[in-house]
Amino acid sequence: MSEGGKIPLWIVAVVAGMGVIAVVGIFFYGAYAGVGSAV
């Protein structure tokens, strides 16, 4: 594995994981907010 200025895999994994968690969190927050306002 050569270090040719490539981004470390763990950084990519952390960023991707945080992005997924953020999207899921926003989705659930929107769902709960929508249900709360509807009810």
From Swiss-Prot:
- BP-aspect Gene Ontology terms: photosynthesis
Q: Which compartments does it reside in?
A: Cellular thylakoid membrane
Q: How does it assemble?
A: PSII is composed of 1 copy each of membrane proteins PsbA, PsbB, PsbC, PsbD, PsbE, PsbF, PsbH, PsbI, PsbJ, PsbK, PsbL, PsbM, PsbT, PsbX, PsbY, PsbZ, Psb30/Ycf12, peripheral proteins PsbO, CyanoQ (PsbQ), PsbU, PsbV and a large number of cofactors. It forms dimeric complexes.
Q: Which organism does this record belong to? A: Picosynechococcus sp. (strain ATCC 27264 / PCC 7002 / PR-6) (Agmenellum quadruplicatum)
Which GO terms of the cellular component aspect does the record hold?
Answer: photosystem II reaction center; plasma membrane-derived thylakoid membrane
Name the residues that span the membrane: 7-27
Any idea what job this protein has? This protein is a component of the reaction center of photosystem II. One of the components of the core complex of photosystem II (PSII). PSII is a light-driven water:plastoquinone oxidoreductase that uses light energy to abstract electrons from H(2)O, generating O(2) and a proton gradient subsequently used for ATP formation. It consists of a core antenna complex that captures photons, and an electron transfer chain that converts photonic excitation into a charge separation.
UniProt key word Thylakoid: yes
Q: Could you tell me the keywords of this UniProt record?
A: Membrane, Photosynthesis, Photosystem II, Reaction center, Thylakoid, Transmembrane, Transmembrane helix
Q: Transmembrane: is it a keyword of this entry?
A: yes
Where does it mainly reside?
Answer: membrane
Family, per entry: Belongs to the PsbJ family.
What Gene3D superfamilies does the entry give? 6.10.250.2070
Name of the protein described by the UniProt record: Photosystem II reaction center protein J
Membrane topology for this entry?
Single-pass membrane protein
Q: Which SUPFAM superfamilies match?
A: Photosystem II reaction center protein J, PsbJ
What Pfam families does this protein's entry cite? PsbJ
Classification of source organism: Bacteria, Bacillati, Cyanobacteriota, Cyanophyceae, Oscillatoriophycideae
| Top-level division of the source organism's lineage | Bacteria
